[in-house]
């Protein structure tokens, strides 16, 4: 399999998942410059993903998957021994619920406008208001919990990648103590720390 990523983008969630699954030998990591739409070997990334965004995953069958909500559960299912996603039932639906919340209420609603130089002041103001409500909801859920579900899952990988952006937009997670404690706890996990350190190095070198 080939995983297409850009350093410190939301594709960090997929790298965390790969490392958590111990799947480095099964998945090639392909870096993408989202500004030039080229991979590091010069290939046209839009020929792989017409949307030009990361992540994208080439499956063993040669299919291309895009979007975190599709890629992360797929990766978890390829390596079931790692227990990174519930196999079915209500817990699988709860995983989908959290992936949807992270993607829509935090990633796109909060951080995309705050990180974009094209977003106007009104959009950024709305994003900060949404951050307050979204992180408050998350904080309430995480009180007394180590992870979003009963154990570390691909939803935690995605949430960690998104919360990592807070440092770049002036959001202090300490305002939400349970979120701050969660972020510190998850980023201390060896596979998460490794993924973040590697991507920070690539980001700084870009």
Language-model regions, residue ranges each:
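Conserved beta-strand edge residues that scaffold enzyme active sites
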Residues: 32-34, 180, 200
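GST-like domain detector, emphasizing the conserved glutathione-binding G-site
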Residues: 1-125, 129
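Terminal-tail/helix-coil boundary detector
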Residues: 197-206
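GST-like fold's C-terminal all-alpha helical module
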Residues: 75, 98-191, 195
């Amino acid at each position: 399999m080939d995983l297409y990523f850009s350093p410190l983008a939301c594709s960090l969630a997929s790298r965390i998942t790969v490392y958590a699954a111990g799947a480095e030998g099964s998945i090639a990591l392909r870096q993408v410059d989202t500004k030039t739409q080229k991979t590091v070997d010069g290939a046209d990334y839009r020929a792989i993903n017409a949307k030009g965004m990361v992540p994208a995953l080439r499956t063993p069958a040669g299919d291309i998957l895009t979007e975190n909500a599709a890629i992360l559960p797929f990766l978890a299912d390829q390596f079931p021994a790692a227990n990174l996603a519930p196999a079915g039932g209500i817990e699988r639906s709860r995983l989908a619920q959290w992936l949807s919340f992270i993607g829509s209420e935090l990633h796109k609603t909060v951080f995309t406008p705050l990180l974009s130089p094209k977003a106007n002041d009104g959009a950024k103001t709305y994003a900060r208001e949404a951050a307050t409500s979204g992180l408050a909801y998350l904080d309430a859920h995480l009180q007394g919990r180590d992870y979003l579900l009963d154990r570390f899952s691909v939803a935690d990988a995605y949430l960690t990648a998104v919360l990592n952006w807070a440092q770049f937009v002036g959001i202090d997670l300490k305002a939400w103590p349970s979120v701050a404690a969660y972020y510190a706890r998850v980023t201390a996990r060896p596979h998460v720390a490794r993924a973040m350190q590697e991507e920070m190095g690539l980001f700084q070198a870009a």
